[in-house]
């Protein structure tokens, strides 16, 4: 009593305490960072190694395997995958969520150093690593276009000036430049002219290398002057190389221009990029794992004026894609929902109390509780994100409950004519324990969430802590500020009060009287009520088993990624045309705003596209509906497939794939894997629960296999190295010399002219000059025939691996898809030597699915323990928890009604319902117990009176919680698909629970009272 009186009798101190909480919250809000979701990125490090000319199998066995053995010993690695392609290996290390990425990077460097002695000596450089996840969508894409500069020049500016500066920005992990390559002098040889002049390809290479050298020439010290010696030993343009003498034929010089076309071009002509239908160079910007997207994008945008100033004015530097606008729009929508929720909750209070002064009290208590939470969020290192703001939106209904319970009880005494000061003291004392029980038991629901491991635990930790802090502050405000304001603002006017609430009061009184009659019937027919309660328990089980489930709601971020997978033998020219065709099809869709893409590099049968959709206000379809509409049009393009997927804020795993979900096949025998992968892929492609089924197994690349006749070669005086050099000089885009410039280094690239590189019959025109000076055609000592060759070799751990990727059809669920995949594997009879397992998001989904029921049971057990401690009873917590089955039925039925799968967001809604619906029972049980202890009445009469007495606050708190969640259900802007499942679950659970628990709780109370009387004759103890 003295505790409450302290705050009621000292209004200045209480007001200043409230102001301190509010000011600290305002300061915390101004300092909080902004992000789409809590920081849940797995620490991922990518290791790269290269050995030019090595085929994929050689890279896998001689480079990837030794590195994997060393890297696999690092503590905290939970997944290691590698891809080896022509001349390069890329290893992706995914660490535990709790592992610090900087510490992991140090361990990776130590492992690379230890493995160095096991690597081939022909590697031009040591393996390197980057702190980045290659499967993560870029945070920004910039394009360079120009009417006056060539693609090579644009690439030069992009890589030399722009990429370097952007990569230095805090939060940026990597800047990939695509769409072309660095400028170079290209020497395009004519084999026929070389043969006629008697000049070998290697002689041309040696002549060019000897003519372009950069060596120190020294200096001369005269008597009074120091002279630096500098010669014109470098040739920097194609014009300078053309007159170069490469050979003498019968005393006549053979110049390079006589046997080759020498042009200023690019290092690798097999690269192409496009944006808005025209050639472009792309800057694809990725962030470090854990870096804040909004803050990183803002830093890059701040550098834009300086970046544009560093390049010529005739080069246009534009932002083609930016992930931040939809994130900001989504957060704006959540903030709008929060404001609407606060307004609706206060409206509920006004409708019931019909007093401006009384309504002012929760109108102050609710914002103070929410604003004060921002201070704790800042101290905990949280951010303003969709989940934390959703927690505050839902908290609106919770924090007002405490104020409503206190305010309504004080108002009841005021209506009875009690003086305000006495009414405030008496009212808060009567419900103080009730409010404390409701708040502590609600916070207890989140204890299992806080202890939950893995990504779901990390994801919802901010949600749980934010909501718990808001409830804690609300508890303090309700027991201090609320009674103080009631004592000083409200007046005791019973007659006037009756007049003010006459209209609504008559309706509420009629409802209350009807409830009393129906409750009296229920207490007389307890068996029927118990049948209803047991039926809800059974219905919960059936609904949970049957409802479709998914990991996380499919988000519409307004961004899509497309991956082109063409025939493995496709030429670059055809692949470039496929890119143009696909971009034209996608760009023509009315929902698409812009499309950029590029192809080329070491894997010529693949390409990437980045698609930005129009804002939601300008399109009617979701991103998934756009993908479904485009899927039919894209399927008509022969020889290639474009797989589209919507960019998500959460993506698990480091492997690059063409779709959102992965199923990985593992085998120690590569031959067995290559035998069974096509069978499994074909079976999965037939499943209606899956879409866009594809594989990363690339073992059908076209290869022209040459067989040397070594005896003939020995007789002709030709060794294998000369033959290999011939092929490399002709078809390898061989970099034979370096041109040094102040800001960069450029290459002289040699190969045969394009008309020869695009025709297999050009092999007939190749020749070498032996030691006798004779021109020997390649066909004299070699035969060739078409064959298949792997374009890439994949590992997971130390096993050969092949990942089958898939998307979900529109309306499909991940639970149905994973179950269908498992059935297909069983029906196929895949041998034990080939193992299958889900990877990435699908793997985390399965792990989460196994723990969902345990999490719910743990939450219920925790609440039971807390209530048992508070009530010093084993029985009363069961009475209170009997409200849960009806809430579960309502939540699951609502999800079914809205055709929404059961996701992690819906799971959180179920957890919240455990905390919400028990409040009704707590208010009933508290007053019934007090009536039995002090009124010497029967259990039936006590629970009947308690139910009628607490009917108004029960309805008020339920409607407050319902209206607090309603804006989430009705939201339709950016990020609505993330908010709606939470709102649907809570509203559905509250509606059904409210209808049933008003009857089931009193009946359960009676049942347990009878059991207590049967097994114990001890009277109820009075707890002071």
Curated annotation (Swiss-Prot):
<feature type="transmembrane region" description="Helical">
    <location>
        <begin position="333"/>
        <end position="353"/>
    </location>
</feature>
<dbReference type="InterPro" id="IPR023931">
    <property type="entry name" value="Multidrug-R_MdtC"/>
</dbReference>
<feature type="transmembrane region" description="Helical">
    <location>
        <begin position="469"/>
        <end position="489"/>
    </location>
</feature>
<feature type="transmembrane region" description="Helical">
    <location>
        <begin position="984"/>
        <end position="1004"/>
    </location>
</feature>
<dbReference type="GO" id="GO:0005886">
    <property type="term" value="C:plasma membrane"/>
</dbReference>
<feature type="transmembrane region" description="Helical">
    <location>
        <begin position="435"/>
        <end position="455"/>
    </location>
</feature>
<feature type="transmembrane region" description="Helical">
    <location>
        <begin position="897"/>
        <end position="917"/>
    </location>
</feature>
<feature type="transmembrane region" description="Helical">
    <location>
        <begin position="875"/>
        <end position="895"/>
    </location>
</feature>
<dbReference type="InterPro" id="IPR027463">
    <property type="entry name" value="AcrB_DN_DC_subdom"/>
</dbReference>
<keyword id="KW-0813">Transport</keyword>
<feature type="transmembrane region" description="Helical">
    <location>
        <begin position="387"/>
        <end position="407"/>
    </location>
</feature>
<keyword id="KW-1003">Cell membrane</keyword>
<feature type="transmembrane region" description="Helical">
    <location>
        <begin position="12"/>
        <end position="32"/>
    </location>
</feature>
<feature type="transmembrane region" description="Helical">
    <location>
        <begin position="853"/>
        <end position="873"/>
    </location>
</feature>
<comment type="subunit">
    <text>Part of a tripartite efflux system composed of MdtA, MdtB and MdtC. MdtC forms a heteromultimer with MdtB.</text>
</comment>
<comment type="similarity">
    <text>Belongs to the resistance-nodulation-cell division (RND) (TC 2.A.6) family. MdtC subfamily.</text>
</comment>
<keyword id="KW-0812">Transmembrane</keyword>
<protein>
    <recommendedName>
        <fullName>Multidrug resistance protein MdtC</fullName>
    </recommendedName>
</protein>
<keyword id="KW-0472">Membrane</keyword>
<feature type="transmembrane region" description="Helical">
    <location>
        <begin position="953"/>
        <end position="973"/>
    </location>
</feature>
<dbReference type="GO" id="GO:0042910">
    <property type="term" value="F:xenobiotic transmembrane transporter activity"/>
</dbReference>
<feature type="transmembrane region" description="Helical">
    <location>
        <begin position="360"/>
        <end position="380"/>
    </location>
</feature>
<keyword id="KW-0997">Cell inner membrane</keyword>
<keyword id="KW-1133">Transmembrane helix</keyword>
<dbReference type="Pfam" id="PF00873">
    <property type="entry name" value="ACR_tran"/>
</dbReference>
<feature type="transmembrane region" description="Helical">
    <location>
        <begin position="528"/>
        <end position="548"/>
    </location>
</feature>
<dbReference type="InterPro" id="IPR001036">
    <property type="entry name" value="Acrflvin-R"/>
</dbReference>
């Amino acid at each position: 009593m003295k505790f409450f009186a302290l705050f009621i009798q000292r209004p200045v101190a209480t007001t200043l305490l409230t102001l301190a909480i509010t000011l600290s919250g305002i300061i915390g809000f101004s300092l909080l960072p902004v992000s789409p979701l809590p920081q849940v990125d797995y620490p991922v490090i990518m290791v790269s190694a290269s050995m030019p000319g090595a085929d994929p199998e050689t890279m896998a066995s001689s480079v990837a395997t030794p590195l994997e053995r060393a890297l696999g010993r690092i503590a905290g690695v939970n997944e290691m995958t590698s891809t080896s392609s022509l001349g390069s290996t890329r290893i992706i290390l995914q660490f535990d969520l709790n592992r610090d990425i900087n510490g992991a990077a140090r361990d990776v460097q130590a492992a690379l150093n230890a493995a160095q002695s096991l690597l081939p000596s022909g590697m031009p450089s040591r393996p390197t690593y980057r702190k980045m996840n290659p499967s993560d969508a870029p945070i920004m894409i910039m394009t360079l276009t120009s009417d006056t500069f060539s693609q090579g020049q644009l690439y030069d500016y992009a890589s030399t000036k722009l990429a370097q500066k952007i990569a230095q920005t805090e939060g940026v992990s990597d800047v990939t430049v695509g769409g072309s390559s660095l400028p170079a002098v290209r020497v395009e040889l004519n084999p026929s002219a070389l043969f006629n002049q008697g000049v070998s390809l290697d002689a041309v290479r040696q002549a060019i290398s000897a003519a372009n050298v950069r060596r120190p020439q020294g200096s001369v010290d005269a008597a009074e002057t120091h002279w630096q010696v500098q010669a014109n030993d470098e040739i920097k343009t194609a014009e300078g190389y053309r007159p170069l003498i490469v050979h003498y034929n019968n005393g006549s010089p053979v110049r390079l221009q006589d046997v080759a076309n020498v042009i200023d071009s690019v290092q690798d002509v097999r690269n192409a990029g496009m944006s808005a239908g025209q050639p472009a160079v792309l800057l694809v910007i990725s962030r470090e794992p854990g870096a804040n997207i909004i803050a990183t994008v803002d830093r890059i945008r701040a550098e834009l004026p300086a970046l544009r100033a560093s390049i010529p004015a005739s080069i246009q530097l534009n932002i083609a894609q930016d992930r931040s606008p939809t994130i900001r729009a989504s957060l704006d929508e959540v903030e709008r929902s929060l404001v609407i929720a606060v307004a609706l909750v206060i409206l509920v209070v006004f409708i019931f109390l019909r007093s401006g002064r009384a309504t002012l009290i929760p109108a102050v208590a609710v914002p103070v509780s929410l604003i004060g939470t921002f201070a704790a969020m800042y101290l905990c290192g949280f951010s303003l994100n969709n989940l934390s703001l959703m927690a505050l939106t839902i908290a609106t209904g919770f924090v007002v409950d405490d104020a409503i319970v206190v305010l309504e009880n004080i108002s009841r005494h005021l209506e009875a004519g009690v003086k305000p000061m006495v009414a405030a003291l008496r009212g808060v004392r009567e419900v103080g324990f009730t409010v404390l029980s409701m708040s502590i038991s609600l916070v207890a629901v989140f204890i299992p969430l806080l202890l939950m491991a893995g990504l779901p635990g990390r994801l919802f930790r901010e949600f749980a802590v934010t909501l718990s802090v808001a409830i804690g502050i609300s508890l303090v405000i309700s027991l201090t500020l609320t009674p103080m304001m009631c004592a000083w603002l409200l007046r005791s006017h019973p007659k006037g009060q009756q007049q003010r609430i006459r209209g609504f009061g008559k309706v509420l009184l009629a409802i209350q009287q009807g409830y009393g009659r129906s409750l009296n019937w229920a207490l007389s027919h307890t068996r029927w009520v118990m049948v209803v309660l047991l039926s809800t328990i059974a219905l919960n089980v059936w609904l949970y088993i049957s409802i479709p489930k998914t990991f996380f709601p499919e988000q519409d971020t307004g961004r899509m990624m497309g991956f082109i997978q063409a025939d493995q033998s496709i030429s670059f020219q055809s692949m470039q045309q496929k890119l143009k065709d696909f971009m034209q099809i996608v760009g023509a869709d009315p929902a698409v705003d812009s499309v950029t893409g590029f192809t080329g590099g070491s894997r010529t049968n693949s390409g990437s596209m980045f698609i930005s959709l129009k804002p939601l206000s300008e399109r009617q379809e979701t991103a998934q509906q756009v993908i479904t509409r485009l899927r039919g049009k894209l399927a008509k393009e022969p020889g290639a497939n474009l797989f589209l997927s919507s960019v998500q804020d959460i993506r698990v795993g480091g492997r690059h794939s063409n779709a959102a979900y992965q199923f990985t096949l593992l085998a120690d025998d590569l031959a067995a894997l290559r035998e069974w992968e096509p069978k499994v892929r074909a079976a999965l492609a037939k499943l209606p629960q899956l879409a866009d089924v594809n594989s990363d197994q690339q073992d059908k690349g076209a290869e022209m296999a040459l067989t040397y006749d070594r005896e003939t070669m020995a007789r002709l005086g030709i060794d294998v190295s000369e033959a290999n050099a011939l092929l490399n000089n002709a078809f390898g885009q061989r970099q034979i010399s370096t041109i040094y410039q102040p800001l960069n280094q450029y290459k002289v690239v040699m190969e045969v002219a394009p008309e020869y590189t695009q025709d297999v019959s050009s092999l007939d025109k190749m020749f070498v000059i032996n030691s006798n000076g004779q021109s020997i055609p390649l066909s004299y000592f070699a035969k060739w025939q078409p064959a298949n060759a792997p374009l890439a070799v994949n590992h997971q751990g130390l096993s050969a691996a092949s990942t089958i990727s898939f998307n979900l059809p529109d309306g499909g669920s991940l639970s149905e898809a994973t179950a269908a995949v498992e059935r297909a594997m069983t029906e196929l009879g895949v041998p034990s030597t080939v193992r299958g397992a889900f990877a990435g998001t699908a793997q985390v989904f399965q792990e989460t699915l196994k723990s969902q029921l345990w999490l719910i049971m743990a939450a219920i057990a925790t609440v039971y323990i807390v209530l048992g401690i508070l009530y010093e009873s084993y029985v009363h917590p069961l009475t209170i928890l009997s409200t849960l089955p009806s809430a579960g039925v309502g939540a699951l039925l609502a999800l079914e009604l809205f055709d929404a799968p059961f996701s992690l967001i819906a799971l959180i809604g179920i957890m919240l319902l455990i905390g919400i619906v028990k409040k009704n029972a707590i208010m009933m049980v508290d007053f019934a117990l007090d009536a039995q202890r002090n009124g010497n009445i029967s259990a039936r009469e006590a629970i009947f009176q308690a139910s009628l007495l607490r009917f108004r606050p029960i309805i008020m708190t339920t409607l407050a919680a319902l209206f607090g969640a309603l804006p989430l259900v009705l939201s339709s802007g950016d990020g609505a698909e993330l908010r709606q499942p939470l709102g649907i679950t809570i509203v559905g659970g509250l509606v059904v629970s409210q209808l049933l628990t008003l009857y089931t709780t009193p009946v359960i109370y009676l049942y347990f009272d009878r059991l207590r009387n049967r097994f114990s004759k001890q009277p109820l103890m009075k707890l002071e």
